[in-house]
């Protein structure tokens, strides 16, 4: 049988210590109380808390009005940045299209003048330089291997005439005449290699 305790004690009817909300051991105005098999707010919260809240709101009202009437600093700073030009990162985006078009035309003119002043190199010269670089690389490799004594590569009959890879032999810059000449002059060697493979 539960003990009847007056509600003026902020405990409720027949509320024991183990039946406090959330397992609380000490009674407080923040904890709800168990009344007639359901939890409700603490005793006296319906009137007293509302009065306290209204009083706090009335006390803070002048401060809120001062804050509301204060000028907004962020839009002012943004407006100033926009007028002055902003950061260097976004300054180009704010320039007018006319200014940007003029700057592009100047850059194109400078690049065109630099390209016209540069010496033009024909494709045949590039191909000759590539062939020379391949020959030099092969000669250096052969020399390095023979000096080390590891799998020495015998020198070919002619160091100037180097058999090039197929991609280089049929390079577009060689032209039809050079490709035909290469096929005619290497036909005998190819036939001999085919005969050797068959035997």
From Swiss-Prot:
The modification N6-acetyllysine is found at residue 26. One of its GO terms (molecular function) is DNA binding. Residues 2-23 form a propeptide. A motif (Nuclear localization signal) lies at residues 189-199. It comes from the Viruses. The modification N-acetylserine is found at residue 2. Cleaved near the N-terminus by the viral protease during virion maturation to form the mature protein. Induction: Expressed in the late phase of the viral replicative cycle. All late proteins expressed from the major late promoter are produced by alternative splicing and alternative polyadenylation of the same gene giving rise to non-overlapping ORFs. A leader sequence is present in the N-terminus of all these mRNAs and is recognized by the viral shutoff protein to provide expression although conventional translation via ribosome scanning from the cap has been shut off in the host cell. Plays a role in the inhibition of host immune response within the nucleus. Interacts with cellular nucleosomes and immobilizes the host immune danger signal HMGB1 on chromatin. In turn, prevents HMGB1 release out of the cell and thus decreases inflammation. Also plays a role in the wrapping and condensation of the viral DNA. May also promote viral genome import into the nucleus. This is Pre-histone-like nucleoprotein. It comes from Murine adenovirus A serotype 1 (MAdV-1). The lineage of its organism: Viruses, Varidnaviria, Bamfordvirae, Preplasmiviricota, Tectiliviricetes. The gene is L2.
């Amino acid at each position: 049988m539960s003990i009847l305790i007056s509600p003026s004690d902020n405990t409720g009817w027949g509320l024991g210590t183990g039946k406090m909300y959330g397992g609380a051991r000490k009674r407080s105005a923040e904890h709800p109380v168990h009344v007639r098999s359901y939890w409700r707010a603490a005793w006296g919260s319906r009137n007293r808390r509302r009065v306290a809240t209204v009083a706090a709101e009335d006390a803070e009202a002048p401060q809120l009005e001062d804050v509301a009437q204060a000028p907004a600093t962020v839009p002012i700073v943004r407006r100033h940045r926009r007028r002055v030009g902003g950061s260097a990162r976004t300054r180009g985006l704010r320039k007018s299209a006319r200014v940007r078009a003029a700057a592009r035309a100047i850059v194109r003119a400078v690049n065109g003048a630099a390209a016209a002043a540069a010496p033009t190199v024909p494709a045949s010269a590039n191909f000759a330089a590539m062939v020379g670089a391949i020959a030099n690389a092969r000669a250096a490799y052969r020399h390095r291997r023979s000096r080390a004594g590891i799998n020495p590569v015998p020198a070919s009959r002619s160091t100037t005439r180097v058999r090039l890879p197929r991609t280089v032999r049929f390079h577009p810059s060689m032209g039809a005449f050079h490709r035909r000449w290469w096929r005619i002059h290497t036909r005998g060697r190819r036939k001999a290699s085919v005969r050797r493979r068959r035997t």
